[in-house]
């Protein structure tokens, strides 16, 4: 499902350089299950046949012992790798807790590992997500933020889109005073093909509310993310 986002030039006060931030997403584009149960799709047999066709395309003998079960295994792997299409981000965030004891600062969960696949080459990109939000009255279980990342990551993505979806979902469901999301990832479509530059890391960020409006909050978020102590 394609979200209607476009780059908007802004400034990252924490680093003093221009950055691009996506426009607002429509809630229907990121809060619900992406693939409905009654949505027409190819059968498993058709999917396996498609894999077999690709193997033949690269010049392989699809009848040799090592490849006989490969189409089935690939389809099963896709069921796991892209299960995010069948999961609901909104449901993950809806259970919240009110016992905050007057807590009025932001909550940060950093180093959430993730693996996704780029929508251009269907090759993995992987890295870490750092998420902060400033609650109003209620908070969400910390594991739910990691689950949210997994739901969106287990879909075909761009890193920019993934960053925007995570922030928009938290903003829409929890309605906090602000959200900050920073993703850092290595893209295998760049490290193992094309220019083949291993170790190159891509950073994307998204700020809403107090993080967008207050440069000091952005700077504090970035400082805590980078603190390895």
From Swiss-Prot:
InterPro entries tied to this protein: GTP-CH-I_C/QueF, GTP-CH-I_N, GTP_CycHdrlase_I, GTP_CycHdrlase_I_CS, GTP_CycHdrlase_I_dom
Catalytic activity: GTP + H2O = 7,8-dihydroneopterin 3'-triphosphate + formate + H(+)
Sequence similarity: Belongs to the GTP cyclohydrolase I family.
Region described as Disordered: 1-26
Gene Ontology CC terms: cytoplasm
Enzyme Commission identifier(s): 3.5.4.16
Protein name, entry field: GTP cyclohydrolase 1
UniProt GO MF annotations: GTP binding; GTP cyclohydrolase I activity; zinc ion binding
Binding site for Zn(2+): 118, 121, 189
Keyword presence, Nucleotide-binding: yes
Stored Pfam families: GTP_cyclohydroI
Gene Ontology biological process terms in this record: one-carbon metabolic process; tetrahydrobiopterin biosynthetic process; tetrahydrofolate biosynthetic process
Key words of the record: GTP-binding, Hydrolase, Metal-binding, Nucleotide-binding, One-carbon metabolism, Zinc
Protein's pathway: Cofactor biosynthesis; 7,8-dihydroneopterin triphosphate biosynthesis; 7,8-dihydroneopterin triphosphate from GTP: step 1/1
Assembly and interaction partners: Homomer.
HAMAP family: FolE
């Amino acid at each position: 499902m394609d979200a209607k986002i476009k780059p908007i030039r802004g400034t990252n006060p924490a680093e003093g350089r221009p950055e691009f931030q996506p426009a607002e997403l429509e809630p229907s584009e990121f809060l619900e299950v992406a693939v409905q149960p009654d949505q027409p799709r190819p059968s498993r047999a058709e999917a396996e046949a498609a894999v077999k066709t690709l193997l033949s395309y690269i010049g392989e003998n699809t009848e040799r012992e090592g490849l006989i079960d490969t189409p089935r295994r690939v389809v099963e792997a896709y069921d796991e790798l892209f299960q995010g299409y069948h999961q609901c981000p909104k449901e993950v965030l809806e259970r919240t807790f009110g016992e905050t004891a007057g807590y009025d600062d932001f909550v940060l969960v950093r180093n959430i590992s993730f693996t996704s696949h780029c929508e251009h080459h269907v090759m993995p990109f992987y890295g870490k997500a750092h998420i902060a939000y400033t609650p109003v009255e209620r908070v969400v279980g910390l594991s739910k933020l990691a689950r949210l990342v997994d739901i969106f990551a287990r879909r075909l993505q761009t890193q920019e889109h993934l960053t925007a979806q995570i922030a928009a979902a938290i903003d829409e469901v929890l309605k906090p005073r602000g959200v900050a999301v920073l993703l850092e990832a290595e893209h295998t479509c760049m490290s193992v093909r094309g220019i083949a530059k291993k170790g190159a890391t891509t950073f994307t960020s998204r700020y809403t509310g107090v993080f967008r409006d207050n440069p000091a909050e952005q700077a504090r978020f970035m400082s805590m993310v980078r603190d390895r102590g």
